[in-house]
C-alpha cells in the first residue's frame, strides 16, 4: 500500500514515534521510516506492522474476529457505541486525535470519528485479523500492530482521547500520551452483563467481581474520574447471534459455539456496562 493510499496514517503521522529510537516516523511509499532508517511496513490490508519479529504476539484469531463482526453488525452494542461517542465528543477538539488501545475491529473508534467530524484516530491491537478490519473501518482511522503493555509508539502528550473498550490497560502509557486536557474513556462490564448467557452456558463468559476495585487501584495514581454512565438494556438475540457472542470472547478458546444447541441459548440477554471518563492527575 502506498503512502497516498493511507490517508488515516497521514493524518496522525506527527504523533507517531519509532519504537526503537523514539525518532519521528515519516510516511513513505509502503512503509513508515525514521531518520535512523528503522522501517515498518504497511501491510496490503492497510495496517502498519510496528510489532514484529521476536516481539510479535498473536491476539484474537480469525473465527473470533468474524464472530465479533457479525455480532456487532446486528446493532446489539450500538447503545454502548453511542454512549462512548457522545463522551468523546464532549472532550476533544474537532481535529483531535483518538487512540483506541486494544481496538479490535475498530467498531468504537469508527463511532467516535463519525461523531466528531474532523477527528482522527489510531487503533492499536496485537491481532492481525482484527487490524485488517480496523485499518479500513473509517477513512480517518489508522491501525497498527502493537502490544498494549509496552510503551506506545507515540509521542508524549500527542492524543486527545484514549479509548479502552473491554481491553487490557496500561495506565502509565495512557497518562504519558494524553494531552493535558485529554480524557481516558473506559468501558467495562458490570456483574449483570450477559447474565442469561452465563447462566445457560456455564463456564462461558466470566466476570470478575473484583474488577472494579482493581480498575480503581490501577488508575488512581494517574487519573481522576470525571463522568460515570451506566448503559443497560435487554437485547433480543437469535441463536446464531448468541453463538457469535460466545465466539467473540475468550470463552471461544475452550467452548465450541457451533456445538451449543439452540435450546441451551437464551433468546435475550442483559447488556450492562459502565462507561467512565477520567482526567489526568498530576504526578
Where do the protein language model's features map onto the residues?
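N-terminal auxiliary segments of SAM/dcSAM-dependent transferases
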Residues: 2-58
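Conserved Class I S-adenosyl-L-methionine
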Residues: 13-14, 229-283
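Class I SAM-dependent methyltransferase Rossmann-like catalytic core
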Residues: 57-83
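Conserved class I S-adenosyl-L-methionine
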Residues: 94-104
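Conserved SAM-binding loop of SAM-dependent methyltransferases across substrates and taxa
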Residues: 105-117
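Conserved SAM/SAH-binding beta-strand->alpha-helix loop
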Residues: 125-129
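A short acidic, Gly/Pro-enriched loop at the edge of an enzyme's catalytic core
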Residues: 149-161
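Conserved beta-strand signature within the Rossmann-like core of class I S-adenosyl-L-methionine
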Residues: 182-189
Amino acid at each position: 500500500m502506498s503512502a497516498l493510499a493511507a490517508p488515516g496514517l497521514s493524518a496522525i503521522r506527527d504523533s507517531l514515534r519509532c519504537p526503537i529510537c523514539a525518532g519521528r516516523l515519516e510516511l513513505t511509499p509502503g512503509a513508515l521510516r525514521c531518520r535512523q532508517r528503522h522501517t515498518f511496513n504497511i501491510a496490503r490490508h492497510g495496517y502498519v506492522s510496528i510489532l514484529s519479529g521476536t516481539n510479535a504476539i498473536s491476539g484474537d484469531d480469525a473465527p473470533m474476529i468474524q464472530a465479533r463482526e457479525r455480532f456487532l453488525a446486528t446493532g446489539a452494542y450500538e447503545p454502548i457505541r453511542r454512549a462512548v461517542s457522545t463522551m468523546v465528543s464532549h472532550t476533544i477538539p474537532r481535529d483531535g486525535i483518538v487512540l483506541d488501545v486494544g481496538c479490535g475491529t475498530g467498531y468504537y473508534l469508527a463511532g467516535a470519528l463519525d461523531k466528531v467530524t474532523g477527528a482522527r484516530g489510531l487503533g492499536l491491537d496485537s491481532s492481525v485479523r482484527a487490524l485488517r478490519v480496523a485499518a479500513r473501518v473509517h477513512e480517518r482511522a489508522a491501525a497498527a500492530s502493537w502490544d498494549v503493555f509496552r510503551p506506545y509508539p507515540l509521542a508524549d502528550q500527542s492524543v486527545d482521547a484514549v479509548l479502552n473498550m473491554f481491553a487490557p490497560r496500561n495506565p502509565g502509557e495512557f497518562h504519558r500520551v494524553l494531552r493535558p486536557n485529554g480524557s481516558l474513556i473506559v468501558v467495562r462490564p458490570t456483574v449483570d452483563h450477559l447474565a442469561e448467557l452465563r447462566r445457560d452456558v456455564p463456564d462461558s463468559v466470566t466476570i470478575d467481581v473484583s474488577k472494579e476495585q482493581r480498575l480503581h487501584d490501577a488508575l488512581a495514581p494517574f487519573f481522576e474520574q470525571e463522568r460515570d454512565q451506566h448503559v443497560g438494556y435487554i437485547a433480543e438475540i437469535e441463536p446464531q447471534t448468541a453463538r457469535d457472542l460466545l465466539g467473540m470472547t475468550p470463552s471461544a478458546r475452550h467452548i465450541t459455539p457451533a456445538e451449543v444447541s439452540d435450546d441451551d441459548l437464551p433468546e435475550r440477554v442483559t447488556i450492562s456496562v459502565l462507561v467512565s471518563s477520567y482526567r489526568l492527575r498530576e504526578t
